[in-house]
Amino acid sequence: MIVNYSSSSSEEESGSSSSPSGKRQKLDTETSEALDHGSAQRKVCKSSHLTPRLPLPESVKEMFRDSEELWTDKSEEHGGRLRSFQHERGNWATYVFFPYDPEEAFLEVLNKMMAAAEAHDIPLTVSEEFHLSLSKTVVLRHHWIQPFVQSIRTSLTHFQKFYCVAYKLKVYSNAEKTRTFLGMEVSTGTPHLLELSKIVDETMKEFNLSTFYEDPSFHISLAWCVGDQTERLKKACLLELQGLIDAHEDGPFHARLNCNELRCKTGNKVFVFPLQ
């Protein structure tokens, strides 16, 4: 383009010194048309040698996908469970809990309880992981995760580890009445759990999130079923299931939970907070 501009200038100068204005205008027009034609030829020539562009990898496309993209909850993909809130990209389901690592005796009793419930036509599904919740499940935006975790970590600096014991079976349901849970309620260690839940609540308030229940029933979640089966489970077989715990060969079974590290699960990430 620079070369063309120079050529046009030199011709324009020579025309202005020896030709009338009408002739100069005609020359300018012809030169302009010639330049346009030449430019078009170069563009065609250049485009004919272009290498086809490679498609963007899916991982790159995901980086720029709209964070508000609609998502359909397919309950059949996860045992009929429905989300308590709509899924949106950038929103992370989050809760705070103590993990429970079950011993062999616990699993033996649990299997007997599942068989007993099945006999009453109540198909319970064993929890994928056993834990004791210290918060409701809330939604965190991705950019809140680090400050949220740091707030909890700072609050727990001087909290001492302890243990708690769960023994009595109890039936629970979620707020939406879409799932029913069989849990083992804590009988020892409740004051420590209450204190911890209040600490977690302070962090929840910082981010305008829902705090824990006013009168919480701390428990280890054992199993669940779809729908509101609370009354049916209580009437049909709760006493029978409790009897299996009481009749354990080594005496009534008590689930002991060593509370030495609190955890926070947000999406697929788990953060650990060791207690002193």
Curated annotation (Swiss-Prot):
3'-5' RNA exonuclease that trims the 3' end of oligo(U) and oligo(A) tracts of the pre-U6 small nuclear RNA (snRNA) molecule, leading to the formation of a mature U6 snRNA 3' end-terminated with a 2',3'-cyclic phosphate. Participates in the U6 snRNA 3' end processing that prevents U6 snRNA degradation. In addition also removes uridines from the 3' end of U6atac snRNA and possibly the vault RNA VTRNA1-1. The active site is at residues 131, 219. Its EC number is 4.6.1.-. UMP binds at residues 213, 217-221. It holds the Pfam family HVSL. GO terms for biological process: hemopoiesis; neutrophil differentiation; regulation of RNA splicing; U6 snRNA 3'-end processing. The keyword Phosphoprotein applies. Its main location: nucleus. It catalyses: a 3'-end uridylyl-uridine-RNA = a 3'-end 2',3'-cyclophospho-uridine-RNA + uridine; a 3'-end uridylyl-adenosine-RNA = a 3'-end 2',3'-cyclophospho-uridine-RNA + adenosine. Coiled coil: none annotated. It is found in: Nucleus. HAMAP family: USB1. This is U6 snRNA phosphodiesterase 1. GO terms for cellular component: nucleus. The lineage of its organism: Eukaryota, Metazoa, Chordata, Craniata, Vertebrata. Belongs to the 2H phosphoesterase superfamily. USB1 family. InterPro entries: Usb1. It comes from Danio rerio.
